Amino acid sequence: MADNKAKKEQVHDVFQNISGKYDRLNNIISFEQHKTWRKRVMKEMNVKSGSKALDVCCGTADWTISLSKAVGHTGEVIGVDFSENMLEVGKRKTKDMHNIQLVHGDAMNLPFEDNEFDYVTIGFGLRNVPDYLATLKELNRVLKPGGMIVCLETSQPTTPVFKQCYKLYFKFVMPIFGKIFAKSKDEYEWLQQSTFNFPDKEKLKRLFNQAGFSNVKVRSFTGGVAAMHLGYK
């Protein structure tokens, strides 16, 4: 429990500090590929108009905005994040989108009823929580029976060429970005640690199954540097 609390505090501090630069940093680090990955995931989801969606670890609300457009004016999207500063950025971006509500909350203890949402998403956020399985079980709790869970996250490359490029990127390129964007060494180191320590796509699929999700589909992007996990309750 002490380790979980320490990780929570560390991650909270990191995102509080980088919130103003997060969108730009995300674009640069992924070479804007995160936008392409999210579009492909949204196409795969085929979100129904009028539905209710929850975007967990919504950050500055990029995926929340995509979901808002998909559910339409008769639908509802709630974004939840535990960084107040990230939410403030998200609120500025979504101020004219009336089907979006952004709330402060913990992914491991969501402030929602059981079986409340048709869709639950978590994008580039699962790697930041202290307990992956406990978080997935909490997402399962708030999802309606038959509802869809989707995770878009960094992953471990599977092809030899991408594996080597991945290692070189983190060894030589990431330190440059860290010096430019991070206010402290802790922030830069967290970006590396959270990516390298995150389970590969097969291990993550097993966690989805353990959390109670079924028919879990996995799709890799850009040589395996990112992956989608899509399942049902």
From Swiss-Prot:
Kindly state which keywords UniProt assigns to this record, in alphabetical order.
Menaquinone biosynthesis, Methyltransferase, S-adenosyl-L-methionine, Transferase
Q: What is its EC number?
A: 2.1.1.163
One Pfam annotation reads Ubie_methyltran
Q: Which Gene Ontology BP annotations are present?
A: menaquinone biosynthetic process; methylation
What pathway is it annotated to? Quinol/quinone metabolism; menaquinone biosynthesis; menaquinol from 1,4-dihydroxy-2-naphthoate: step 2/2
In terms of SUPFAM superfamilies, this protein maps to:
S-adenosyl-L-methionine-dependent methyltransferases
Q: Which EC main class describes this enzyme?
A: transferase
Q: Which GO MF terms does the UniProt record name? A: demethylmenaquinone methyltransferase activity
Q: What does the record give as the function of this protein?
A: Methyltransferase required for the conversion of demethylmenaquinol (DMKH2) to menaquinol (MKH2).
Q: What's the protein name?
A: Demethylmenaquinone methyltransferase
Native organism: Staphylococcus saprophyticus subsp. saprophyticus (strain ATCC 15305 / DSM 20229 / NCIMB 8711 / NCTC 7292 / S-41)
The gene from which this protein is expressed is menG
